Amino acid sequence: NAEFSYLMKYNLEYDKKDISELKKAGSGVVRHYKNKFQRPRPYELAKEMNMDFDSMELISDSMKTPAYPSGHSLQSRLIAEYYGKLYPKHKENLIELADECGYGRVVAGWHYPSDHTTSVKIADKLINMVDIQESIIDIPRKTYAPAVFDNADTNNPKIKASVVKQIQDQIKVFEKEF
């Protein structure tokens, strides 16, 4: 990853776990929208329409998913934004590397420009919602469970209706923008 190389080149501290968590957060959002919109990749559409289309060949599991939005664009932007906050003097260069990563996939014929630009917009919103420093998973269940679950102290806890509603409301707000 270009972000790793950059951080290493300038001896900037980074945590592979943090990067992994950012990628995981981005991946969940990307999967949601890929499944929702099922947009074919440019080379797939060209093939179906019997059009000549020049694209780079890549055999990868990520290429077996729909095009929209671009996971690489979203994840690299999340990483760039996160480390850009930690190292403001390097933010512009990190963003530039993230854009190269994402837009390079457009140039390769694997994505449409809107796959990239939408992913950047999603990442810019998502970075303010992601807190990788402490996850609810990392907190002992007894600490958070009563606020989140009914029957929290049993083997069969149920998420509280108020929590489900809050999550559904957040998803609706997020989807209006994308």
Question: What is each model feature region?
Answer:
Residues 1-111, 117, 121, 125, ...:
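Hydrophobic alpha-helical bundle signature of multipass membrane enzymes
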